[in-house]
Amino acid sequence: STQGVSSAASDVYKRQLVHLYSIDYMSSDPHNQRFFCYLSLFTFFMVLLVAGDNYFVLFVGWEFIAVCSYLLINFWFTVIEANKSAMQSFIVNRVGDMALSISFLGIVCLFGNVDFSTVFSLAPMMNESALTIIGLLLLFGGMGKSAQIGLNTWLPTAMAGPTPVSSLIHSATLVSAGVYVLLRSSPLLEYSSTALIAITWIGSITAFFAASTGLLQNDLKRVIAYSTCSQMGYLFLACGLSQYNTALFHLVNHAFFKALLFLSAGAVLHATFDQQDQRRLGGFLPLLPFSYTSILVGSLSLMAVPFMTGFYSKDLILELACSQYVFHGSIAYWLGSISAGLTAFYSFRLVAMTFLTYPNSPKKIYESAHDAAIFA
């Protein structure tokens, strides 16, 4: 399928870059062999999830990426914060997984098959109420993985793992799995207007909630984490408006600029002895020019500045929402537009507080700060 090929291509390509980045980032860690083992396992099951041609294979990949994310977030297992974050991520995702399991059982009972081609070809002949229930359960399952409102508590705390893990979880793998399920099940969702309206509302509210929460964050990685939550809201919004191709387009774009933001943030943390509080940074532009450029480019794309990749997909989602002459389409447009403004504000705030303001860190940090070795 188009969704599977696009997701797998962006996922594998981005993981290659993350692996290269991790070679230097994790070079001083005595357990880096275990780290790369987990990373490769995560890649395998994510590709399995998007490459399967039936719901059973999808479910196997879905469950195992949750296990791999637990292992990666809890990589530094002697740190209490990492233990708590990994457990929270695993437990919150179980809530959504339960709904997804029930939806798959419903598909088996209703269609007697789990192959995508068979299920989708029989969908027009099935009861609309049954398809609505399955659609709502698929939505609830996707909400857990994609950190939609109500099940989003695990995403900001998933920062406890190494920065390459944050990049994987927040850009094109774990959080995109929920959106992928909706994209892959789009022929079923089209027979349930109730499910589509619910998806639109959930996505719109999440985009606004996460963007407004991001305004109040001072942790460098948490700001980017809440931007992920907000962008997932845009993807759900697009799916609810039946604009699946646009959602897939933004999913691929988001994968790259969000990975760029996280990996660049990791380079900043590497240079500042893991200082994540933006209020204690500042003045690093002359010392970290490549990191600054990378974060600036990623932020401009996140803000949907014209001629950046994020502009072509994010602006298109808002344009399509505006063209929907229904109440939930108007709500989606206005909440999405306000969220875009808030996103621009906290993205510029991140760049300014980290690189452009007056130096607020100890002198020894500025004396030793330098760009990551990959830039040398």
Label the predicted regions.
Residues R15-G61, V67-A376:
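Hydrophobic transmembrane alpha-helices and their helix-loop junctions in integral membrane proteins
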